[in-house]
A protein has these predicted regions:
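Flexible mid-to-C-terminal extensions adjoining Fe-S/redox cofactors in radical SAM and related proteins
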Residues: 1-16, 249-302
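Canonical Radical SAM [4Fe-4S] cluster-binding loop centered on the CxxxCxxC motif
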Residues: 3-50
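Residue-level signal for mature regions of secreted extracellular proteins and peptides
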Residues: 19, 23-26, 68, 230, ...
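Short cysteine clusters
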Residues: 26, 30-33, 237-239, 253-254, ...
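Cys/His-rich zinc-coordinating "finger/knuckle" motifs
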Residues: 33, 37-41, 244, 261, ...
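Radical SAM/AdoMet-radical enzyme domain recognition
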Residues: 56-69, 78-169, 176-178
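Acidic metal-phosphate-binding loop of nucleotide-sugar-dependent transferases
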Residues: 74-75
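A C-terminal junction/extension of Radical SAM enzymes
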Residues: 171-258
C-alpha cells in the first residue's frame, strides 16, 4: 500500500478494549459463527461466579481506562449478566460497556445503566423475528442508549434482498448507526472469499459512513475489504485489544494463544501492569477484524 498511517478517525490508544465471553451459549446456530467454531468442546459453558469475580477484580486494578465488550454466546441470557453490569459500571477506570446482542430476547424490561451501549447483530439466515429485532433497537434508542446495528453480509445470494431490506429499514431509524459486517472464513484470520456478484450487488455500501483514515483519505469497511487494503505486515500496530474467554483466560487479541495466555484468577494484576499501549509488529498479511482495523498502525521505514 502507498499509505504510511492508518486508524479509526476517533481512535484513542491510551485505553484498553476488553472483549469478554462470559458464556458460550446462544439461541441461534449461525453457520459462520467464529466463536462456536473456535470454542469447540468449550461451547455450551457458563463462567462460574468465581471466574466472573476474578475478571471483575482484575479490571478493577487496571492502570488504564477500559471499554468492555460483552460477547459470547449471547451475553443477555447469561445468569450473571446483570451482576456483571452492576459491578463493572461502578469501577473507577470503566468508560463504556458494549453489549453485543442478537436481540432474540425481549429487551424492553432491561434496567438502566449509564455508559452502556448496544451493538445489535442482524443474522439474516437465523433471526427468528425481525420485527422484535427492530422493536428492541427502537426501544433502546428511545431510552437514550447509543445503538449500532451490525448487519451480517451473508454470502448466500438468496438472502441478499433481506439484507438490503434490513439496511433500508435501519436507515429510517433516527439515531441508529449502521455497520455492514463482513464474515470470516474458517478462522478469524481469513475473510470469507466473496464472489464478484456480491461486490456488485452491495456496491451501494461504498457510499456509507467512512471512518477509517489512511493518511488523509477516508474509507469504509466495504471499500477496504473489496480493494484488499488490509495488508499491514511489518507495520507498528498499537493494538490495545484483549479478549477474555469463558474460563477467565486473557490474551492479546490477534496474537497466537499458545504462549500468550494468562488466567485472571491466578494473575489479577494483568491489566494493572499495562500502563501504556506499546506497538506490536503486525505478523499478518491481512487484517480481517473490523475492530483491529480501527487501531493506529504506522508503516516502518525499510
Amino acid at each position: 500500500m502507498k499509505y504510511s498511517r492508518q486508524h479509526h478517525i476517533q481512535q484513542d490508544p491510551d485505553h484498553i478494549n476488553v472483549h469478554w465471553d462470559s458464556l458460550t451459549i446462544c439461541q441461534l446456530h449461525c453457520s459462520y459463527c467464529y466463536a462456536r467454531n473456535e470454542y469447540g468442546k468449550e461451547w455450551g459453558k457458563i463462567s462460574s461466579k468465581e471466574i466472573i469475580d476474578g475478571v471483575i477484580e482484575s479490571l478493577n486494578r487496571s492502570s488504564l481506562p477500559f471499554n468492555l465488550g460483552l460477547l459470547g454466546g449471547e451475553p443477555t441470557i447469561g445468569p450473571h449478566y446483570y451482576y456483571i453490569l452492576d459491578k463493572i459500571t461502578k469501577l473507577e477506570k470503566f468508560k463504556w460497556v458494549y453489549v453485543v446482542t442478537n436481540a432474540e430476547k425481549d429487551l424492553t424490561t432491561h434496567p438502566h445503566y449509564d455508559n452502556l451501549a448496544f451493538l445489535f447483530s442482524y443474522h439474516p439466515a437465523d433471526c427468528t423475528d425481525p420485527e422484535r429485532f427492530i422493536n428492541n433497537i427502537k426501544h433502546m434508542l428511545g431510552r437514550g442508549y447509543k445503538c449500532k446495528v451490525n448487519i451480517m453480509l451473508h454470502h448466500d445470494k438468496k438472502l441478499w434482498p433481506n439484507i438490503k431490506a434490513m439496511i433500508e429499514t435501519c436507515q429510517g431509524i433516527k439515531g441508529l448507526r449502521i455497520h455492514p459486517h463482513f464474515l470470516y472464513g474458517n478462522t478469524i484470520q481469513k475473510l470469507f472469499n466473496y464472489r464478484k456478484d456480491f461486490w456488485e450487488y452491495f456496491a451501494f455500501l461504498e457510499d456509507y459512513e467512512k471512518d477509517l483514515a489512511y493518511d488523509d483519505e477516508l474509507f469504509n469497511d466495504f471499500q477496504v475489504f473489496r480493494d484488499k487494503m488490509t495488508d499491514f505486515q511489518g507495520w507498528s500496530c498499537y493494538n490495545n485489544n484483549y479478549e477474555i474467554d469463558v474460563r477467565g483466560n486473557v490474551v492479546k487479541f490477534c496474537l497466537g494463544k499458545e504462549d500468550n495466555v494468562v488466567n485472571l484468577l491466578r494473575d489479577k494484576n494483568f491489566f494493572n501492569r499495562i500502563e501504556k499501549t506499546i506497538p506490536m509488529i503486525c505478523p499478518h498479511k491481512a487484517c480481517n477484524c473490523d475492530g483491529l482495523l480501527k487501531q493506529l498502525k504506522v508503516r516502518n521505514d525499510s
